[in-house]
Amino acid sequence: MYQQSLINPVSDIVTIQGAFLNSKALEERRNLGQFFTGLVVSDYMASLIELPDEKTVRILDAGAGTGILTASAALHCLKIGCNSVHAVLYELDEKALPALEQTLHIIRKIFQSRQASFTCEIYCEDFVLARPDKNTSVQSFDVAVINPPYFKYNVKYGGFI
């Protein structure tokens, strides 16, 4: 298991992502449409988030991977004054879940150190096929950070080609 440093948690998140990428063959990642977002892009995307009126910011990450987009978004929310963030993450690749959980653990610790709250739900399923938009009990989201898999969906039969 990866040991978190107390000095630079963002660097730790990048290290977690790198270790996961190095653990998978390129062909396997291609078959799943996995092309992970880097820190510069995820930080830029997060910088576009404005402080909403809600007390708790709700983030949707529909292709979570190792969680770098959620991490950047949550940390930006904390930086601009939001002390409560709830993330709902979908990740199709079961093998990515340990790295994703490590990232979310780091985010929780950062929030706790600032007397703030970070909570999350992880779903190991295909966001497109799960159709959470059809569930009337699902709360809306303030932020969606999405780097979806790169492959074609078979609209007629569900699943991807």
Description of each model-found segment:
Residues 1-161:
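SAM-dependent methyltransferase catalytic region
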